[in-house]
Amino acid sequence: MSPRAKRRKRASPTDLYRTCKQAGTCPPDIIPRVEQDTLADRILKWGSLGVFFGGLGIGTGSGTGGRTGYIPVGTRPTTVVDVGLAPRPPVVIEPVGASEPSIVNLVEDSSIINAGSSHPTFTGTGGFEVTTSTVTDPAVLDITPSGNGVQVSSSSFVNPLFTDPAIIEAPQAGEVTGHVLVSTATSGSHGFEEIPMQTFATSGGDGGEPISSTPVPGVRRVAGPRLYSRANQQVRVRDPAFIDRPADLVTFDNPVYDPEETIIFQHPGLHEPPDPDFLDIVSLHRPALTSTRQGTVRFSRLGRRATLRTRSGKQIGARVHFYHDISPVAPEELEMEPLLPPTSEPLYDIYAESDFLQPLDSDVPAAPRGTLSLADTAVSASTASTLRGATTVPLSGGVDVPVYTGPDIDPSVGPGMGPLVPVIPAIPSSVYIVGGDYYLLPSYVLWPKRRKRVHYFFADGYVAA
């Protein structure tokens, strides 16, 4: 018996209607159900033409009884019906026609207007007297200036921005305060305000002055290469050939290259570069000029080592930052003058050999105490040894030379070595115990039973005499 095929569920009528309506491939029961054109729907449509059921909800709806639902006969609905607000009565407008009279008072009532005080009347006597006269001759005006000389006027304006004043006069107190607008030059004491001036830039200083001009606003600085990251090994190059001939430090050959571009090196299997810092370097990138915190210019190049090589031929290595500091101009050195007076004794080096050092007398007997044994050079002392307590002895040998401090001492009168007498020690070499019993200290007796085994000593008790 063959297995029964699994029944697949058909899609909903709504989904089938959307896809098959336009193509015309819908099943016969899909279109009447979606468009509500079944036999039951037609009976309800025909019956509703002659029967009206109101809001009972009898029809093709959900059968909930309409808005208020189904309630028992003789009871009130449990829901509250919102009846809303009562409408306001309309405002009655009385139209006024053109035939109806309109009374407008054109003359105002004069009883409400104050007439004011009476005007004074002039009788012509008293007050000002006005004299009138009539002149018939024309008026002649003399506009010729007095004198026969020519008058010339000149004005000059001094711009302090372009003219250096020869004499500067301090302003008065009123001109400084700003309350007096016009003033004249007067003699005597003047009040003025002193403003301290600040020097912004000098030609030579201690290095704290600005090294660049005021930056232009809106200029965006271009990010430089990251030379001091953790991924780069820092190597300082002291050879100045690194600036113009970096290839000479990597290989003995001098390939044709552009110093402003990246230099690629091809090394044999075993090679030794002229500079050991450039071992296994296969490429040097273009140079970069930066500044350090000390104000010097630093010449830098990034390189790559080929330390490992895989089977596929790929080279793996670390990145190296080679840099060379361009030293600034060295400051001028001043010759130092000696500060000691010319009459003072010169200082001598005990390690230096001088021509004016005189050899010591080899017949001087050696002292039994404080003997200094020197090696392999002639013993000599300077002429400054005549001073009390000052003797210059170089590190030389060949003869045992006594060295003394303090005043001059004659070696022949030095103390001699007498016979040594042994001293009997006061502490006895053996211990004698006089008594019969030995008692342990109470602190050791009262210990608990479970204790660590402790070795007792003779000093942990006492002897009964």
From Swiss-Prot:
Disulfide bonds, paired cysteine numbers: 20-26
GO CC terms: host cell; host cell endosome; host cell Golgi apparatus; host cell nucleus; viral capsid
Protein's cellular compartments: Virion; Host nucleus; Host early endosome; Host Golgi apparatus
NAD as UniProt keyword: no
Short sequence motif Nuclear localization signal: positions: 1-11, 446-454
Single GO MF descriptor: structural molecule activity
A Pfam family the protein falls into: Late_protein_L2
GO biological process, one term: microtubule-dependent intracellular transport of viral material towards nucleus
Coarse class of the protein's main subcellular location: virion
Task of the protein: Minor protein of the capsid that localizes along the inner surface of the virion, within the central cavities beneath the L1 pentamers. Plays a role in capsid stabilization through interaction with the major capsid protein L1. Once the virion enters the host cell, L2 escorts the genomic DNA into the nucleus by promoting escape from the endosomal compartments and traffic through the host Golgi network.
Family listed: Belongs to the papillomaviridae L2 protein family.
Quaternary structure and partners: Interacts with major capsid protein L1. Interacts with E2; this interaction inhibits E2 transcriptional activity but not the DNA replication function E2. Interacts with host GADD45GIP1. Interacts with host HSPA8; this interaction is required for L2 nuclear translocation. Interacts with host importins KPNB2 and KPNB3. Forms a complex with importin alpha2-beta1 heterodimers via interaction with the importin alpha2 adapter. Interacts with host DYNLT1; this interaction is essential for virus intracellular transport during entry.
Protein name: Minor capsid protein L2
Organism: Human papillomavirus 57
Lineage: Viruses, Monodnaviria, Shotokuvirae, Cossaviricota, Papovaviricetes
